[in-house]
Amino acid sequence: MKLPKPSEGGAMESAPAGTHIGVCYRFIDMGTQKTEFKGEIKHKRMITISWLLPDELMSDGRPFSVHKRYSWSMHEKSTLRKDLQDWRGKAFSMEDFEGPNAFNTKKLIGQPCMLSVTQDVRDGNTYSNVSSVGKLMKGVKPGALTEPTIYISLEKGEFDKDAFDMLR
């Protein structure tokens, strides 16, 4: 397959800035990725969480989606831990990390939340960024998921090839 010409790639619509209802529809374990921070190169396990914005539609009628990459770390200062605690509305305890009632990230799929979306313009392109994740307010009903849900874990015994094949 030939690569498209740069003018044929099409511009992506950016999700509008503001506070939105989001529904998690993808959790992707990306494995170990090469990252650079302050000039230092490291290899870190990364994940991506994706949300649909059911009340915000693109020009083709489909809902916008937004994504956030995280280091796979639950250290007290990690962004993943902060966002998950804000999303669920309570801090993690040791029981959430071990034992039969340990928190399973698969529970995130289909879960609604409040998202703060900001926009960043770089090189003439506008990018939408998830700046914060919060618990859905009482009484607020999220829209229905209109895209297939995908959960991919690279943990031993959890990889789902069919889910992987659904990525586009």
What are these regions (language model features)?
Residues M1-R168:
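Short beta-rich binding modules
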